[in-house]
Amino acid sequence: MIATDIGIDLGTASILVYIRGKGVVLKEPSVVAFDRDTNKIKAIGEDARLMLGRTPGNIVAVRPLRQGVISDYTVTEKMLKYFIQKAVGKKTFRKPRISVCVPSGVTEVEQKAVEDAAYQAGAREVAIIEEPIAAAIGAGIDISKPCGNMIVDIGGGTSDIAVISLGGTVVSTSIKIAGDDFDEAIVRYMRKKHNLLIGERTAEDLKIKIGSAFKRPEVEYMEVRGRNLVTGLPMTVKVSSEETEEALRETTSQIVEAIHS
């Protein structure tokens, strides 16, 4: 019987699975697609994401995690079990030891929900680690030293800000402003500035490719296709990195304020 040690970053937008000795073996969206008529799960992760917009209206997408915590326990449990089995494979193995990252501001009840979901998904042992600690270790910082390290971990649903020293968290805060809010800000900006309706995936592409929190020395451009809110017809707009900086300014400033406080 083969024992496995697994690390899971249970994010609002995506899930990463790490296996000791192999590294990150899986990164997929935290999305579950299910049939609204039968209430049965049709796909999980990347397969679920690919189904969106290409399937009948009875297929809907669910994000079982919201702002870093479980919003749908049953679906989260099934999603975790699916990803663990996919990462480990079909071979016979002892129940794995699992470490799961959670935002620094989660309550005991929320933490217990994550722990229970991991056990129900097949864990032998479960360890809960605060995301800033995991981020610091992953960045190669020696957190055992007697000096302060500030960590800012911007996820999909939450941003964690912490000062870490001597192996522990000195002070921390978790705000529910993060990557999803950047996407929504871009969607709002495109609607207001260009009368163009775009989806979350298109907004995320814009953010990743030319998104900026400050003015760049060189302006970058990207063509975006959506629906004209005036005519209802498809329309393509050329968007600049200067525009994304403007779109993200308010959301970025909220994270900066949290860091300063």
PLM regions: where:
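Nucleotide/phosphate-binding catalytic cleft detector across ATP-hydrolyzing
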Residues: M1-I154, A162-S261
